[in-house]
């Protein structure tokens, strides 16, 4: 079973979301998602300053197996991207919840967080797949 940190929120599309001390949210893909995709070869990052809506595809993770869209779990403004992925996309595989984060977003509507899954619900989703 994949590692599913309890403090994170999850989307049904296998993105995770972590609230930071400054009020922004860090987004990445789950350990389960990176296991399905396999070894990352490239991550197409969103533009800092771009405004996205929840569910918008805003990044792409390319692996040896496939290219997969990464969706914004909440609406808001992209405030940072993980430039380390340009040289080291494999961080998404080795550290999906730490060094392999993809972007940070300033949420424009925090009520959207209510539609995300907690760790227990995400684990149940994986068991149903």
From Swiss-Prot:
Cofactor requirements of the protein: (R)-lipoate
Gene name of the encoded protein: gcvH
Cited function: The glycine cleavage system catalyzes the degradation of glycine. The H protein shuttles the methylamine group of glycine from the P protein to the T protein.
Keyword S-adenosyl-L-methionine set for record: no
Pfam families per UniProt: GCV_H (PF01597)
Record's GO cellular component terms: cytosol; glycine cleavage complex
Family: Belongs to the GcvH family.
Name this protein carries in UniProt: Glycine cleavage system H protein
Domain (Lipoyl-binding) ranges: 24-106
Keywords: Lipoyl
The protein's assembly and partners: The glycine cleavage system is composed of four proteins: P, T, L and H.
N6-lipoyllysine carried by residues: 65
PANTHER family: GLYCINE CLEAVAGE SYSTEM H PROTEIN, GLYCINE CLEAVAGE SYSTEM H PROTEIN-RELATED
Cofactor: how bound: Binds 1 lipoyl cofactor covalently.
Biological processes annotated in GO: glycine decarboxylation via glycine cleavage system
């Amino acid at each position: 079973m994949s590692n599913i940190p309890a403090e994170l929120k999850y989307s049904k599309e296998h993105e995770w979301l972590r609230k930071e001390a400054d009020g922004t949210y860090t987004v990445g893909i789950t350990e389960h998602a990176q296991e399905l995709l396999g070894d990352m070869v490239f991550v197409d990052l969103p533009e800092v300053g771009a405004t996205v809506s929840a569910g918008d595809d805003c990044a792409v993770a390319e692996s040896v197996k496939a290219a997969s869209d990464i969706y914004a779990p909440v609406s808001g403004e992209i405030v940072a991207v993980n430039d380390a992925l340009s040289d080291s996309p494999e961080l998404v595989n080795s550290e999906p919840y730490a060094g392999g984060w993809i972007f940070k977003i300033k949420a424009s509507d925090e009520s959207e967080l209510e539609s995300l899954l907690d760790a227990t619900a995400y684990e149940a989703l994986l068991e149903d797949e």
